[in-house]
Amino acid sequence: DVLMFRDPVCSTYNFPRERVMFLPERNCNPFFHFIEGLWMLAGRRDVEPLARFVKRMKEFSDDGNFLYGSYGYRWRNQFGYDQLHDVVQKLKDNKWDRRIVLSMWDPVHDLHYKGKDVPCNTQIYFKAYPTKELGEENNQIKLDMTVCCRSNDLIWGAYGANAVHFSMLHEYI
């Protein structure tokens, strides 16, 4: 059964470095998600390194070799350039820039793709803000990261694997 929500669902991670959520319903290997996060940051899409840890990973590949919707590959290669490099550079150039968007959805290919692995998460927005303006006593600059999702499994995807992956991306940026 799929639980459907009429309105958008929003989750806030106040402690993103606490990457792993341990839920009795979800028996997972937290080290695998860490390895997968590094694999993403490297811009890979080959399934073999992940299949060494979780054999079922090949079931999500159309050809047994590559994951079509690999976020890391899309961050680093999909659109002909390294988006992560540009995100970091834009923040260095102007930390208050509100146009920093990391795309994972490729409308030219994904909208009509019939395969197994279409990205659930579509975009990520980055926004820096001064904490003093939010009532905090110290005046630090924090980086907010908002992940937009078209569809996701809350326990297995969002609160499981994606919490680890995106917290690593947040720290990398």
Residue ranges and their predicted role:
Residues D1-I173:
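Terminal, non-catalytic protein-protein interaction segments that mediate quaternary/complex assembly
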